[in-house]
Amino acid sequence: MWDSSMFLSTLTPKFYVALTGTSSLISGLILIFEWWYFRKYGTSFIEQVSINHISPWINGSDGQSESSNGSGSSSSSGSSSSSNGGAGGGGSGGAGASGSGSATTSTGTQMPECKVWRNPLNLFRGAEYQRFFWATSKEPLTYYDMNLSAQDHQTFFTCEGDARKEEYEIMQTAWRERNPMQRIKSAHSALEINAECAPAYILLAEEEAMTIMEAEKILKTALKVAEINYRKSQATQHQGAIADGMHRRDTNVLIYIKRRLAMCARKLGKLKEAAKMFRDLTKEIPSIMSVLNIHENLIETLLEMQAYADCHAILAKYDDISLPKSATICYTAALLKARAVADKFSPDIASKRGLSQAEMSAVEAIHRAVEFNPHVPKYLLETKRLILPPEHILKRGDSEALAYAFFHLKHWKQVEGALNLLHCTWEGTFRMLPYPLERGHLFYPYPTCTECADRELLPAFHEVSVYPKKELPFFILFTAGLCSITALLALATHQYPEPMGHLAQTVLTWISYPFQLLKERIEAFWPCNLLQQLSRV
């Protein structure tokens, strides 16, 4: 019979050093890989493998049948979900929103994809973003964000009828050019060829103008040119597909210029003029309107005018279950309800007598807004630093929260007590959402793709807000502990070989003692010769 004591006595300290060193090395490699995988994908690799591969293999055919049924239901619902998402947000570039993955709930229904939308309140590159760069030497926009804008501009401002028109071919290249000075130079070249090239004026207003007043002046010139081109193409739009495409392009150019002019009026303090222009634009029907979300510009202007009754009317029209939600819609609804009770709200009094009906309605509106986008309160309460918003946003993501808070923080400050009410109640939302990635309360579960998309949209110097806050998986903690313990054992064995050898033998003796005791008890209860007697029978 194998003698364990003889085996242990023959082991040298070098064996223990090699054993613990090898174990420490393997544990360290596993730890590094787990940490890298967690940082990139937000989950543990070992946990994913055990859940997705080992568990179904252990469960057998039942797990496989459930998996096949689940995939069938999700694929059948995926087509309808993608078609609905396309209608709501459009395709990449052409409709101003690009898909970046989808998620499937535990019930088999597919949630809408994470889409990147144009920021309705995007700033001017020359008059605003460029001045930030001069002041801080930090790039406020990412290449990914600017590339999406280039795709949008190509889709909005070009068409098949531009073939063999040198000025429009120059502008097609200009939108894709990374160097801003080269883009401006190309726009001037296009205007030298054709003084009625409206897209060239748009580029100059966006990037060459160093003030809002300069941008407004260029856009007014562009508006005159765009109206002339619009009337020309309107008269010939029925002469074929190419003529119809040119008319759509001229319509997009005209609406875009009017929108930017209204935004200039808003920035220059001409609020009534801006509100009228935004109202007129919301009555337009072309497909570009679903991308620009001009009603959000109108809401922000009305809040600046403190025309709260008009804001109520806009929300009644756009805060509908069939329309895509936004932080502007949800948080403006919460602000208007908070306005009725915020000035008299006191958490101490409310804890004693309870919430009134109006206060309960305001708190529920805040919880609804926080569920839609949980990143906004940190910026409104100024616990996190604001930066310039990107040109594109991800709904329910940190980019949308930045864009909303950048323009709406002052509106919350104008309403006395609104920020205090938000501060006292917003964290209560998370008690209703213990598993926000799996089940929502009023909206779909929170999408898991927001963090990756926001990192592409937001500059590197900004710390992206993550929800829900990720905790280190058990496997990473376990591997880190195992690696540390084995490394310490290897070091101690190398420094003190004989004491560590005695310690190892003592530990093994302690571990084997219960089994030895159990063996003796069994032998006392069940004699060894019993089996021999049974075999004779």
UniProtKB/Swiss-Prot annotation:
UniProtKB keywords: Membrane, Transmembrane, Transmembrane helix
Biased composition (Low complexity): 67-84, 100-109
Major subcellular location class: membrane
Keyword Plastid on entry: no
Biased composition (Gly residues): 85-99
Any one cellular-component term (Gene Ontology): membrane
Similarity comment: Belongs to the ST7 family.
Identification of the protein by name: Protein ST7 homolog
Organism placement in taxonomy: Eukaryota, Metazoa, Ecdysozoa, Arthropoda, Hexapoda
